[in-house]
């Protein structure tokens, strides 16, 4: 019985499993735009990608709310413009992108948003 349970767990996909880990998207996007990945700041926070103009937070689209505050914090500490790359793995995730864009526009937040899939 124990072996059957282990076999079933190994063969079934994990709930909420991502197509690729966040780091996959960070490496691909950041290298394309000549950025530096995993930059540790003086307060020990870690920016996913820093480019010449931006301090960028990467998150899966359903974690949109976290990305806004993190990006603003990184911008404050680095003196760069805040950036967010939302990872969209399902077309339905675009609703989260719209939420972020609406909030940024409504409050005139200095944040740029990109989408990757």
Task: Pin down the residues of each PLM region.
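Short glycine/proline-enriched coil/turn segments at helix->beta-strand junctions
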Residues: 33-36, 51-54, 77-81, 109
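Nucleic-acid nuclease catalytic cores
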Residues: 59-65, 76-117
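Short, surface-exposed coil-to-beta transition loops
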Residues: 66-70
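Sec-dependent N-terminal signal peptides
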Residues: 3-13
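Acidic-basic catalytic patches of nuclease active cores, encompassing PD-(D/E)XK
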Residues: 14-52
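Conserved catalytic cores of phosphodiester-cleaving nucleases, focusing on short active-site segments
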Residues: 49-60, 74
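Active-site phosphate/pyrophosphate- and oxyanion-stabilizing loops and adjacent acidic/basic residues
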Residues: 27, 72, 101
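A general lysine-centric signal
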Residues: 2-3, 80
């Amino acid at each position: 019985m124990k072996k059957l349970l282990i076999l079933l767990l190994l063969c079934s996909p994990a709930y909420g499993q991502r197509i690729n880990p966040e780091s996959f998207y960070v490496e691909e996007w950041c290298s394309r735009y000549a950025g530096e990945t995993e930059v540790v700041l003086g307060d020990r926070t870690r920016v996913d990608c820093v480019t010449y103009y931006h301090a960028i937070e990467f998150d899966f689209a359903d974690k949109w709310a976290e990305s806004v505050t993190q990006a603003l914090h990184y911008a404050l500490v680095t003196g760069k413009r805040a950036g967010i790359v939302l990872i969209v793995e399902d077309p339905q995730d675009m609703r989260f992108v719209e939420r972020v864009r609406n909030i940024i526009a409504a409050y005139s937040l200095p944040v740029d948003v990109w989408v990757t899939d």
